[in-house]
Amino acid sequence: MFDGVFDYVVDATLRGGHGLFMGRIPNVWYGNQYSRSGGATDYNRFRSFSDTIGVMPAASVADPRFFWLGPTSDYQVRGAYFGDAQGTDPDFEAPSSWRSNLALDLVTANGYEITFEYNLDDVNEGVFYKDLGLERTGQLADGRGVYDTAGDYWLTNASGGGAEAFTWSINKNFNGLNALLAYSTVDAEDIYPLTSTQAESSYGYTQRFDGENLSPRPSSFMIDEKWIFSLDYTAKLIGENDTRFSLVYIRKSGENYSVTYDTGYNSVGGASYGGYDLAYIPTGAADPKVNFANAAVAAAVMDHINSGKLSNYKGTYAPRNAFQGPDYDRLDLRITQDFNVWNDHKLIVYLDVLNLMNLLDDQKGIVEEYSFNNSRQIMVNGVDAQGRVNITGVDPDDSLSVINFNGQSVWQVNLGFKYSF
């Protein structure tokens, strides 16, 4: 198919650019210091009736000052509902990155259109959350620190992270049949995935091993590899009217995810939410750094570890987003039929068969992901007197589920029309 592609080039374009880029500032980040002020407001108590509430500063509820606290308030202000006070570094800068792009477009004498493109993204100012009350109080047998936290989160900047992407594509028309083949690969890293508007959630839902000792890791939003193949053919099957067939196949890598301890509500390290402690991977049933509930549990856990990529991390912890979920592929078909009605008036009827693979086989074309890029595979019940995590079981497929909230894991048939004039 591609014989003679590079025999000679009739047109070549080199393009590129470099610059500092900043997106729209997410103002919601700044709102945390107002909604989590540590005691300047007492709305929660006011909403729920209490006899202890005395005279408020203003007499009329129509006056916004009715809800303000002041020296005339004769009741005791409790701590904030969330028990924390949050702030923003006065030198905080909105996220920005240096971006570079270089691309080469080629057209050959026999009609091939070929593109190579490279993109580099280097973080200039990233986002980092600190807990100003974080205090290391001990260490577990696996080496992770134990921390007391206050929940006083501080929005500040950090360097580190970025992305590299390489793409190539080949396009050619073969006597009415247009074919496209494209491939892209991405390597992207970040420190905080920043999936929440609230500071405590962005902080607590970031998988970690030891407190705030965080380094850039593969992004939760990265698609490692992606292939696209399409065929498009137009013929005149009904008089002089165009009949068009379009077929698009996509295959892409699964999302990154982390393997963590299933600890219930509480974290073993104290610096994250429960279930977001990165798992230490035992070397075997006799690993002195963990405590298995019994021999059967040890055998089940080690069988799971030895059966996959977890075995690469024996004797240490599995880093954040060190694993990939199942790959995904799908095939879409569109058929359109034009009907010339009168002069420039045209009726276009179209038929879409989305996820054709799932129509032919209900086990194909299914998107499977780990919820919030997190899989609590090692079940844990606290820590023993020697600082060893008590391992009670294993759940190899924890949080792995079929994603179908937009219908991406089922087939669909759409029939419609458009009238243009």
Kindly give the residue locations of the regions a language model identified.
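Short loop/turn motifs that connect adjacent beta-strands in outer-membrane beta-barrel proteins
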Residues: 2-12, 110-111, 173-176, 236-245, ...
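Solvent-exposed loop/turn elements at secondary-structure boundaries
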Residues: 3-154, 159, 274, 315, ...
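Extracytoplasmic gating/loop element in the C-terminal half of outer-membrane beta-barrel translocons
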Residues: 243-342, 373-401
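Membrane-embedded beta-strand positions of outer-membrane beta-barrel proteins
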Residues: 14-16, 104, 114-116, 170, ...
